């Protein structure tokens, strides 16, 4: 792990909150040393020309399912942190260790195993065999022990799956309201956030009554109501809409335009390009239109919206780690966020909501996770894919494709 010193000079800076048209950013020993109007460099310090470019904080994907080699794929597209929302601890332990030691991988936080019931989501999507590999919550008495076990595994937050399947054309059991509330309370007792997987408006209402801190999907079975928007605002929750995955589930949107984009295609293995170009096609009664409208209205009301993709493994179609984040930003803009607001949803907002105080902004003393792009994504969001440089803890990434097209098959749910 090297520790270089350099400056990025005469660059437009989006610092996670606002745009500064002309700055110089000084990085030393993996941290941002200074953000100034001018900098008198010496011959010993590398100077990166930022003219015509925009410097962003490294992107934070607020909903993934991390598995080797997803952290490498994520970083290739400027995602410097993934927030995993359901993974087996055996896989996560190694990924945490590698991310702590290496700067060619994105960092990761995890919910470990999500709380669901026997036969509940995601069993209808991944099959009985995979679903049976995970512990479930069988009764109210299990709630405290389930949360304690996840905390012992290293969970950074606790996830509840409140989903009866109706938005996806299924009918499956789900957590009861008393059990969900007990899980959320137990998470808070351990000093952890509780986040809720929902796909229906009724599920969202139940999650809010249970006391979750955030919803990690937007409901899409029906249009939003004034009541649900008021409840979300009153509860102070954030919402990660995962519009990329909602589009795939509702068979409306896939990642074909990303797979075929000349800025991305050379860096995406063939198996992942194929994955991007498909939808789940579940024939669900839900609609991406409902989710986009709900995102728009929640955002207008003042609910914090975070950017997340729900990217998982091969077989979880419609998304891919890293590159799908750029498509998600486009969808957030389609849902009514300005480009600057969409960029906040991928940087400072998730950092604040998930307690990542060392990242998500460009400011002195913070970690030098940086994304340099050609053009101005604060005006045209698609410019985020015109990548000119990526730094992880101050080390510049060499953007080359992975050595192999070998990828993990589906072993974790898209939830």
Predicted regions and their residues:
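Histidine-rich, glycine-flanked metal-binding segment
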Residues: 1-6, 13-56
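C-terminal cap of metal-dependent C-N hydrolases
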Residues: 11, 327, 338, 346-348, ...
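Histidine-centered catalytic micro-motifs
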Residues: 57-67, 187, 193-199
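Divalent-metal coordination cores built from histidine and acidic residues
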Residues: 71-193, 228-266
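Histidine/acidic-residue-rich catalytic or RNA/ligand-binding cores of hydrolases
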Residues: 72, 204-211, 245-265, 291, ...
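His/Asp/Glu-enriched, well-ordered alpha-helical/loop segment
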Residues: 189, 275-281, 288-376
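Glycine-enriched alpha-helix->loop->beta-strand junction motifs that scaffold or abut catalytic
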Residues: 208-215, 234-238, 302-303
